[in-house]
Design a protein with these regions (language model features):
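Phosphate-group recognition and catalysis centered on beta-loop-alpha active-site segments
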Residues: 1-234
């Protein structure tokens, strides 16, 4: 990763490297604003220990989340979800992973009504079946359940049942081993929409491209684009 995660510099850098989509994580502030952040606190990405759900947007926006990565990114702040969409190139997509089990839909509704997000440029992700089901029920936008196969002992039937429970659009699966690769192959062969993460290994990248998965999420977009170019050139 060449820029601090879940920041505008990171998204912009990925777009510049030629990707057609980015994945970001979303949490809700105390005053119900949607911001891009992975963890439930700022401890890992800054010198602050603010808890996201217990602070207002104004308070969280005062925290530098770039300096811990590099002085080059000093004065980089947590973006609103809308700010991430505002820097998105035309005809590109954002995979929006909703981290909590429940959030207010007020801001998402506003973004849909104003045309900021749509089924053409957005795909929701989440780890909670009820949250995914609620997103599907509320919005005309794909929503897919994220799965860590190891939590299911790599059991195809258990995972399939979990996907059905959420009414998931497809499967968003963690790739960590040959077992996980065999699983995603099965899901792809049965016609599921397949998103894979977090793929930083070149061999897995090549194999997933060969398999024809619908999305590969990586911490290293430049490496992935190079692998795609190699495949194109034979």
């Amino acid at each position: 990763m060449e820029a601090p995660e879940n920041t505008l510099p990171a998204y912009i850098k990925a777009w510049e490297q030629g990707v057609d989509a980015v994945e970001l994580d979303v949490r809700e502030t105390k005053d119900k604003r949607l911001i891009c952040i992975h963890d439930d606190s700022l401890a890992r990405v800054s010198e602050s220990e603010y808890t996201i759900s217990q602070e207002t947007l104004a308070a969280l926006k005062t925290v530098d989340v770039g300096s811990s990565r590099s002085k080059k990114f000093a004065n980089t702040y947590i973006p609103l979800l809308k700010e991430a969409f505002d820097c998105k190139p035309d005809k590109s997509k954002i995979f929006v992973e909703i981290k909590p089990s429940k959030i207010s839909f007020n801001e998402l509704n506003e973004m849909v009504e104003t045309g900021v997000i749509s089924k053409l440029n957005t795909h929701f992700l989440g780890f909670y079946p009820n949250a995914v089901k609620s997103l599907i029920k509320t919005f005309d936008i794909p929503a897919t359940l994220s799965i860590i196969p190891a939590f299911f002992d790599y059991d195809y039937k258990k995972i399939s049942s979990f996907l059905e429970k959420s009414k998931s659009f497809g499967i968003s699966q963690h790739i960590d081993s040959k077992k996980s690769m065999n699983l995603i192959k099965k899901f792809k062969e049965e016609g599921k929409y397949c998103i894979t993460w977090t793929v930083n290994n070149k061999k897995y990248m090549r194999d997933l491209i060969e398999l024809g998965v619908d999305a590969i999420i990586t911490d290293n977009p430049k490496k992935l684009m190079n692998v795609i170019e190699e495949k194109r050139n034979g």
